Amino acid sequence: MRRILAGITMSLLACTAGLAQHKDPCTTAGTNNDWLGIQTVRLWPGDAPEAKGNACEDTPTLSIFSPHWGNGNGSAVIVMPGGGYVGLAGVHEGREFADWFTERGFHAFVLSYRLSSNGYLLPVPLLDARRAIQTVRARAQDYHIDPNRIVIIGFSAGGHLAALAATDPVPGNPEAEDAIDRVSSRPDYLVLGYPWIGALTTDTAHISYCKQFNVMDRCEALRLAYSPDLLVNKDTPPAFIFHTFTDQTVPVEQSLRFYNALVKAGVKSEMHIFANGPHGVGLGGVDPALEQWPNLLDAWLRAHGLLSPGGP
């Protein structure tokens, strides 16, 4: 009997060791992605569409953070960090916002999308954003969320991506073999922090996507296809936007351009411009006045019934 038990124990230890050795590095927090959640999943079970390889830089993921109490309030948020499409500000524009939302009863998801600096030019990051929204909606029952209470929030380049996802969604294909592809990628609410709306223009942008990634020869086509302010229509979800007057990286005019497009389309939205604050302020701890913007977001979420189970 002792020999049998010893054999079972050794087998279990071997299995455990094997699992430890075969952890997926793309979904496990490490030196370069320590902001990943304990539960992080690949957006596609195999290679992602347009993948150039199978390294982590080729693998979009979604980190999942549970609400601080019970099953939460039935709302979900997908966070899209900024980083100029060359990196991801996964802590102060990702994990910290996941914590902020889970404290309020949300299920939070942080998207790690593919970067243009790794050869993934638009629309590839948009494919990842759409898939993230579809994934959360398709699995709404698993997460105890309402599939019609999905918020997306993006900052800087992540704001450009979030605005694109909100203005250029795919409806879903009811006949698709993959259940995730059957549902719409349209978010229900949009939150933007100092968004790089003018990424594909040079009139007000201090940084040009086309120059940065050497695609000036097709910049006009990219501008027409991937400028969110040109894609706004009456079906665009209501938005909350904040920016600072002194942002030297992404001028406030870019948010104004998007907000004016929302007004023209009749989409009821809210915008706050603060006098002071640099680009990339996150939760706004650099200025006493700017620290208040999360409270304004809290009020906006509350007004839309997203902080209460069952809505308003």
PLM regions: where:
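Short beta-strand element of the alpha/beta-hydrolase
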Residues: 73-82
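Primarily recognizes the serine-hydrolase "nucleophile elbow" in alpha/beta-hydrolase
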Residues: 131-205, 223-224
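Mobile cap/lid helix-loop segments that gate and shape the active-site cleft of serine hydrolases
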Residues: 46, 179, 188, 195-231, ...
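N-terminal cap/lid segment of alpha/beta-hydrolase-fold proteins
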Residues: 23-71
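Catalytic nucleophile-loop/oxyanion-hole region of alpha/beta-hydrolase
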Residues: 89-91, 95-97, 110-147, 287-290
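Short beta-strand/loop motif that positions the catalytic acidic residue
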Residues: 241-243, 247
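Active-site glycine-rich loops that stabilize anionic/oxyanionic intermediates
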Residues: 81-86, 245
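C-terminal catalytic histidine-bearing segment of alpha/beta-hydrolase fold enzymes
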Residues: 65, 242, 252, 256-312
